[in-house]
Amino acid sequence: MIFDTHAHYDDEAFDEDRDQILSSMKDGGVGCIVNVCASAGGFGGTLELIKAYPFVYGAVGVHPDDAGIMTQDTLDEIRRLSHMEKMVAIGEIGLDYYWHKEEAEHKQQQEMFRAQMDIAREEKLPFMIHSRDAAEDTLEIVKEYMKKDMSGGIIHCFSYSKEIAAEYLKMGLYLGIGGVLTFKNAKKLKEVAAIAPLSQIVLETDCPYMAPEPNRGRRNSSLNLPYVAEALAQIKGITAEEVIAVTEENAKRLLFRA
């Protein structure tokens, strides 16, 4: 069944019909979902979801946009929640320079990225990395940590070149691929998907964002992942069923140690 490794069902976009959508997942071929924390102090929604739905798991961490409001208490809370049975990763963490142009902001993000990578290492959990307009700095920090007995991880919503992808693949990491792969102008990502072994790819939505064609611009959900599987299958010259089976196995191997 489909394994969605990165979703945000605690987002307000689902406030009107959250239970209805999540209750339809099994019939839609979706077997597992990881709901990923993002905002500092916004962990409650993920906690509620992993308690309410047996097939929903959690990742706990803070998105780089909130690095400036993180405190030691935030880091302590991430560590505490990482001990929960259904918390399977630290994320989403990383660097985002798109809106944050100042060097001081970059240093702050890097400090909080490293602090959360330390938690991932010490708690023996995989990481989920968000990286936007920060290719070199993200790669440098990940390389540094991958020498320190990490438990692997996913480069979420991968958007860089095939050369950068090759560096992550050499480290044994996974690339998260979602709706962007179906976009006509996604030439760079299609090149990455062509060179990346299927054994190092996982499917993700980043819902409610990043809906694939033919639903681009609408609210996304895990039920759209067959479109992504089909696009990846066409690139690889295999069936969508094989894509779904292998990416599910990949996700379980990384996140469940299965």
For each of these PLM feature ranges, what is it?
Residues 1-258:
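Mid-domain alpha/beta scaffold segments of enzyme catalytic cores
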